[in-house]
Amino acid sequence: MNNNHVYDMLVVGGGPGGYTAALYAARAGLDTIVLEKLSAGGQMALTEQIDNYPGFEDGIDGFSLAEKMQKQAERFGVRSEYAEVLRMDLTAVPKLVETSEGIFRGKTVVLATGADPRTLGVAGEAELLGRGVAYCAACDGMFYKGKTVVVVGGGNSAAADALLLSRVAKKVILVHRRDTLRATKIYHEPLSQAENVEFRWNSVVSALLSGDRLTGVRLRDTVTGEESVVDCDGVFVSVGRQPATALAVGQLALDDGGYIVAGETTETSIPGVYAVGDVRTKPLRQVVTAVADGAVAVHMAEKYIAENR
């Protein structure tokens, strides 16, 4: 596809932030298309159970919630196009997004490309997702109430996850490849005082042990090379996230972690371009915060379009 049609809004990414932006845009009368590589929902679609999104008293699985969001947006005229984005020219007028299915042009662009959790890279990790392997303590911690869990990592996210889990789990084992945490000092004292938090220094996970679910991990000492087995019910991988911002490099301002610099207005360093959800700089990355970003982005985009007619 390569025509001269200009959309009011191009939404890149079909996660909760992207489809909320599309919904609000369509309801505001903006001609809107969502460009998504695979399927709606992003990381949310891989979540087995979501209990912290308002309105679902019994919870809902991520795939079903994603499907509902997509259908709701499309009911108001949003078009969905499944295509891989290959190139973007965000300073062009109109703005240009080249995909595997052709070129799309828009007055504004909402980037909702998300951030993928970095993985352990060990066998069986993907297969055990939702069956003992998790990447979000705030999302899945309550499933491990009274159980033993391992947290892998040594930065702020790992420390925060270990503290959060210490309030619900019977035992938390924090595994770090170095002999001290990289997390800021504010976490050190609370962790050392938590009676149910144990540290395994100079250790990495070399294998996941499982039957139908995770049953434990094998650890390798990075100094001696010795291996040991730790029985546990769950592993929370907290070794950072990788924002999907490769195509924004050289165009938008990014922070040291590769996230798009955008505040609560979701405005980026280029007028008419907005970043929503996990891809932008923010203190909390959850479905509900991504949804809020989507609504704010459209509010700002409407003002931009009105001022640049």
For every predicted segment, state its role.
Residues 80-143, 154:
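Glycine/small-residue-rich loop that forms an oxyanion/phosphate-binding "nest" at active or ligand-binding sites
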